Amino acid sequence: MLIFEGKEIETDTEGYLKESSQWSEPLAVVIAENEGIALSPEHWEVVRFVRDFYLEFNTSPAIRMLVKAMANKFGEEKGNSRYLYRLFPKGPAKQATKIAGLPKPVKCI
């Protein structure tokens, strides 16, 4: 659980929001700080992309799917695991979905 703007926000044991409807961009900043990440425009691009992906497909993308979808939308420069790991060193799929307020990707350990 975390406290945000005087409210209790329920999370699972790994810090993923239990209710993605409670997510907001200011809350994302707090979640990112807890992950040791200062959100840059490049981070936001991925976070928003992951949220859009979830809204369209009703699932959080695992790393392989994330890389492929990012490459399709933004090109090879951003759609590769090296770029994504520079932004999210503990795992792009795991950290980006957590910061985006989404469930942990199914295929993430």
Curated annotation (Swiss-Prot):
InterPro entries: DsrC-like_C, DsrC-like_dom_sf, DsrC-like_N, DsrC/TusE. Keywords: Cytoplasm, Transferase, tRNA processing. GO terms for molecular function: sulfur carrier activity; transferase activity. The active site is at 108 (cysteine persulfide intermediate). SUPFAM superfamilies: DsrC, the gamma subunit of dissimilatory sulfite reductase (SSF69721). Transmembrane segments: none annotated. It comes from the Bacteria. The keyword Cytoplasm applies. Signal peptide: none annotated. Its EC number is 2.8.1.-. GO terms for cellular component: cytoplasm. GO terms for biological process: tRNA wobble position uridine thiolation. Gene3D superfamilies: 3.30.1420.10, DsrC-like protein, C-terminal domain. It is found in: Cytoplasm. Belongs to the DsrC/TusE family. Part of a sulfur-relay system required for 2-thiolation of 5-methylaminomethyl-2-thiouridine (mnm(5)s(2)U) at tRNA wobble positions. Could accept sulfur from TusD. Interacts with the TusBCD complex. Interacts with MnmA. NCBIfam families: dsrC_tusE_dsvC, PRK11508.1. This is Sulfurtransferase TusE.
